[in-house]
Curated annotation (Swiss-Prot):
Domain TRAM: 390-457
Gene: rimO
Protein name per the record: Ribosomal protein uS12 methylthiotransferase RimO
Catalytic activity: L-aspartate(89)-[ribosomal protein uS12]-hydrogen + (sulfur carrier)-SH + AH2 + 2 S-adenosyl-L-methionine = 3-methylsulfanyl-L-aspartate(89)-[ribosomal protein uS12]-hydrogen + (sulfur carrier)-H + 5'-deoxyadenosine + L-methionine + A + S-adenosyl-L-homocysteine + 2 H(+)
Species of the source: Roseobacter denitrificans (strain ATCC 33942 / OCh 114)
Cofactor: [4Fe-4S] cluster
The family this protein is said to belong to: Belongs to the methylthiotransferase family. RimO subfamily.
């Protein structure tokens, strides 16, 4: 019943992976998980705790004694999706506990759905468990349920998100994450490594490192070193790379020390992939966002990174139609894209978020203008993507297999994160492949966002 990615319907989402089947009479809980990968990790933690306490995990509404809805509250559209999911869970099951980012506004939820059993905010794991205990008392089997359990996973067996911190110290005017999740709170590096080691030992082939600001990891704890591991993103990346799995870094801000990561990518210790939220390119727009405004220096930094690691893939997200954005400022963004030649981009039309300081800015952009700019931005980025992928035809690339069916094997290259980037499809000679395999392919064809290829002959 969990959603991964967030645009999947709950009834189409993958089932949680469990270590043992439910037993007769065991109380069961369902989970609907909305929002970003960081919220998905929260859902996994909750389910793991419940599983260890003796609860079964139901993949459908009918089999659950109660349902937890882990909400997203970042944008108005996300709030609407969360309210819809809560309503569906109430209609299908009737016993619903709400948690997550939208839970920071309990009156907003109970005003729309007064019959929910409880509302808790983000990261309030104990309160969620208390609400479950009150609604569905646990009934553990002391010989099975309370043994140390492998964590419940809502992703396929071969990749896993690894959350290294909570919260954020940035004060971007369009964002309310610090209000919902607080300031940066890094995990001890040794705790992150212990989790990563367990994941790899259990068959995970790819670790996706996530947080609100991955490059700030350890700043709040003064980069403390404990048990042989230092809380700094460069040290952590090096340590993770030693485990032998693919390591992919998400949500990295372009601080100067990020350049220390690039040699690790050039040496193959971590994947040559950076997910960096640039958001815009015009300095005046960036200042109105309360973000770093050195777009020209960013281009120089990108060039320096690529000089060290030519295979580096850069992904980013942008906002168009931000309050006050002029046509000239938007054109600067398009020109910057031409120069930066980013491999993967996402783009959002600005919308007000309750509590965000950007709401009060003057000169909001009309909806039709935002839509037009979004269309032009996506056309530009599509052209760049298509040209970059065309250059990969006839190359040999290493890929990880995500799914296999009768028609094709769906894979990803090192340049593709799950759910948000493209795929490489093998539609012939894929019968012996299975999810999690890492194989070499020859690229035969390229599209706008995806590749097609065949297994490369063994040397």
């Amino acid at each position: 019943m969990s959603t991964n990615p967030p645009d999947l319907r709950p009834d189409l989402a993958p089932k949680a992976r469990l270590t043992q089947p439910d037993r007769p009479g065991q109380p069961t809980i369902g989970m609907v998980s909305l929002g970003c990968p960081k919220a998905l990790v929260d859902s996994e933690r909750i389910l793991t705790r419940l599983r260890a306490e003796g609860y079964g995990i139901s993949p459908d509404y009918d089999g659950a004694d109660a349902v937890i809805v882990n909400t997203c509250g970042f944008l108005d559209s996300a709030k609407a999706e969360s309210l819809s999911a809560i309503g569906e869970a109430l209609n299908e099951n009737g016993r619903v506990i709400v948690t997550g980012c939208l839970g920071a506004e309990p009156e907003y939820i109970t005003g729309a759905h007064p019959k929910v059993l409880a509302v808790t905010g983000p990261q309030q794991y104990e309160q969620v468990l208390d609400a479950v205990h009150a609604a569905v008392p646990p009934s553990p089997d002391p010989f099975v349920d309370l043994l140390p359990a492998t964590a419940v996973s809502l992703t396929p067996r071969h990749f896993s998100y690894l959350k290294i911190s909570e919260g954020c110290n940035h004060k971007c005017k369009f964002c309310i994450i610090p209000d919902m999740r607080g300031r940066l709170a890094s995990r001890p590096a040794h705790a992150v490594m212990r989790e990563a080691e367990k994941l790899v030992d259990n068959g995970v082939r790819e670790l996706l490192v996530i947080s609100q600001d991955t490059s700030a990891f350890g700043v709040d704890i003064k980069h403390a070193e404990e048990r042989g591991h230092r809380a700094h993103i460069t040290d952590l990346a090096r340590d993770l790379g030693s485990l032998g799995a693919w390591v992919r870094l998400h949500y990295v801000y372009p601080y100067p020390h990020v350049r220390q990561l690039i040699p690790l990518m050039a040496d193959g210790l971590v994947l040559p992939y950076l997910d960096i939220p640039f958001q815009h390119a015009h300095p005046d727009v960036l200042r109105r966002m309360a973000r770093p405004a050195a777009a020209a220096k960013t281009l120089d930094e990108i060039a320096a990174w690529r000089a060290i690691c030519p295979d580096l893939t850069l992904r980013s997200t942008f906002i168009v139609g931000y309050p006050g954005e002029t046509e000239e400022e938007f054109q600067t963004l398009l020109d910057w894209l031409d120069e930066a030649q980013l491999d993967r981009v996402g783009c959002f039309q600005y919308e007000n978020v309750a509590g965000a300081r950007s709401n009060a800015l003057p000169d909001h952009v009309p909806e039709d203008v935002k839509q037009d700019r979004w269309n032009r931005f996506m056309a530009k980025s599509q052209d760049i993507s298509e040209a970059k992928l065309a250059a990969k035809v006839a190359q040999r690339l290493e890929v990880i297999v995500d799914e296999v069916d009768a028609d094709a094997a769906t894979c990803r290259t090192k340049a593709d994160a799950p759910e948000i980037d493209g795929n490489l499809f093998i539609d012939d000679g894929h019968d012996g492949l299975k999810p999690g395999d890492i194989v070499t392919v020859e690229v035969d064809e390229a599209g706008e966002y995806d590749l097609w290829g065949r297994l490369a002959p063994s040397a």
